[in-house]
Amino acid sequence: MALIKHVKGVHPKFGDDCYLAENATVVGDVVMGDQCSIWFNAVVRGDVNSIRMGNKVNVQDGAVLHCTYQKTKVVIGNNVSIGHNALVHG
């Protein structure tokens, strides 16, 4: 089962029909649309700001999504694929 953690009482929210690999990590202020997938060893860290994903977003193996404290959020549109081991930093 994926590691899903809250930060300061804020829990990740998932749309319908999402897939999380067994060792994926999703933390904090993260909102995912429908039919998203987070693959093996990927990390989506909404611990210091928010991360928003549209529908049908594919975060491939080893990718990391993070944001900057009190500066920039991460916003991903619909039908986006984030490649293996990519770093997306707001």
Regions found by a protein language model. Name each.
Residues 7-10, 26-27, 47:
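Short, flexible, glycine/charge-rich loop motifs used to bind or transfer phosphoryl groups or to couple energy/partner
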